Regions:
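A late C-terminal transmembrane helix in Major Facilitator Superfamily
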Residues: 182-211
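Helix-to-loop junctions at the C-terminal end of transmembrane segments
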Residues: 6, 113-125, 209
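Structural signature of the two symmetry-related core transmembrane helices
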Residues: 128-143, 222
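Paired small-residue
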Residues: 140, 151-159
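Short amphipathic helix-loop junctions that connect adjacent transmembrane helices
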Residues: 83-99
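Intracellular juxtamembrane helix-capping segments at the cytosolic ends
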Residues: 166-179
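Helix-loop-helix hairpin linking two adjacent transmembrane segments in secondary transporters
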Residues: 1-35
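Pair of pore-lining "gating" transmembrane helices in MFS-fold secondary transporters
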Residues: 61-81, 158
Length: 241
């Protein structure tokens, strides 16, 4: 987008709108694809084979819903703040080139530890890593709330990606184990809800940014972090580790 910013600005009166449109359509397509192309014969769509397992699955349905909610809120918060950052960068008088630098830091945080994080989640449990992830997410939002200048944005967006990564890998692992143990399509539904949440974040971003601004959005991020942290305690009886 940056390389052709003048062209997009003349065409749409905004060089950023193309990126938002691509992301919005992509997330909607991804959500539909997960549901459409998951085979009906997949073991994840099969009903429980043993009555005892079925009863346990029913008892744990609330835990499964909480896991899905945690995953969706974590991703939704990241997408909203990440997507609002280019708007904020323009509002403080910086160029679109800075957006690329900030998003690069953010992407580094999202994926730098991904190759090794999964093994540690399996070893030490998803809950420990989700506690760490929600704490990092809170610190990220607090950083950009206190100071939303270029340097603070680089640090804050890096931490935002890092916290998201911890939470996403850990909660996704828990959902996968839950789906296999209780033979439910929870991971399919969860992925679909994540993509729909991203679609919603992009479609409502303009209005939410206009109403509460960037600091308002990161304030919501802090509240979501606290909510995630507290709801983890409700999963004490979930025996999947």
């Amino acid at each position: 987008v940056s390389a052709y910013s003048d062209y997009f600005f003349n065409l749409f009166n905004s060089e950023l709108i193309v990126g938002y449109i691509v992301a919005m359509v992509g997330m909607l397509f991804a959500s539909a694809s997960v549901l459409t192309f998951t085979s009906s014969s997949s073991s994840l769509r099969e009903p429980a084979e043993v009555e005892e397992i079925a009863e346990k699955a029913t008892d744990s349905k609330k835990d499964g819903n909480i896991l899905t909610l945690l995953l969706v809120l974590n991703h939704f918060t990241m997408v909203v703040i990440m997507s609002a950052t280019p708007l904020h960068v323009q509002d403080i008088g910086e160029t679109v080139e800075l957006v690329g630098v900030i998003i690069s830091y953010h992407t580094l945080g999202m994926f730098l530890l991904s190759p090794i994080l999964g093994n540690y989640v399996d070893k030490y449990g998803y809950k420990n890593f989700t506690y760490v992830g929600t704490s990092i997410l809170f610190i990220s939002c607090l950083t950009t709330f206190i100071n939303s200048g270029p340097l603070a944005l680089k640090i804050g967006l890096y931490l935002l990606g890092l916290g998201w990564n911890f939470n996403y890998v850990a909660i996704s692992a828990a959902i996968s184990k839950f789906s296999i143990k209780f033979k439910t399509p929870l991971n399919i539904r969860s992925d679909s809800y994540v993509f729909l949440g991203s679609f919603t974040a992009h479609t409502t971003l303009g209005l939410s940014y206009l109403v509460i601004g960037y600091r308002g959005l990161v304030s919501v991020g802090m509240l979501v972090s606290i909510y995630l942290f507290l709801n983890l305690k409700k999963l004490k009886k979930l025996d999947i580790d």
